[in-house]
Regions:
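Short boundary/hinge segments that flank catalytic cores
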Residues: 1-96, 100-122, 128, 137, ...
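Switch I (G2) and immediately adjacent beta-strands of P-loop GTPase domains
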Residues: 128-150
Length: 166
């Protein structure tokens, strides 16, 4: 497919600021989870790429307080990159990670166990929870997180709500 960007040179030609290129993670070490690779395998090339991204963000984009990671295709590693970057950034800044993929939540898929009911972005938008009830601390870190919440299938009901406009 000629519309897919496959090289750093192709990215450079777009004149869009970039904060890094991640190496493909072919195989995880036994007992490691990709969402915590930055913590669990700090010596990996993946973790080094995350640290480089953090350094670029802190130097080039110091005025920005919000960052969004997105792409047009599923399963490209957006959540993996964003979550590991948040784990890195929380070492030097206060960070709130918001998992906004309400249709396909990843962060909670049995990975973290919280000591209370999970309320998330879906519940905030639907009006069944407020912001403070939906913020969780990631165990073992200072990272705050708002998960997607319960898995949602009827997005049209949620997106049409007045709460999303707020």
């Amino acid at each position: 497919n000629s519309s897919v960007i496959k090289s750093p040179e192709a990215i450079d030609s777009l004149n869009i600021p970039q904060i890094g290129i991640l190496p493909r993670v072919e195989k995880l070490k036994r007992g490691f989870h990709i969402l915590q690779m930055f913590i669990e395998d700090g010596a990996s090339s993946f973790s080094e790429a995350i640290r480089s991204s953090r350094a670029i963000i802190e130097s080039k984009f110091e005025k920005n307080k919000s960052y969004m990671i997105t792409s047009s295709n599923p399963s490209e590693g957006k959540t993996t990159y964003a979550f590991n970057l948040a784990l890195s950034l929380e070492k030097t800044s206060k960070v709130l990670f918001i998992e906004a993929d309400i249709r396909r939540p990843s962060v909670l898929n049995g990975f973290y166990q919280f000591d209370r009911q999970i309320l998330g972005l879906g519940e905030i938008i639907s009006g069944s929870a407020n912001l403070n009830d939906a913020i969780f601390k990631v165990p073992g870190t200072e990272l705050d997180i708002i998960t997607s919440g319960e898995k949602r299938f009827d997005m049209s009901d949620i997106v049409s709500k007045d709460q999303i406009k707020k």
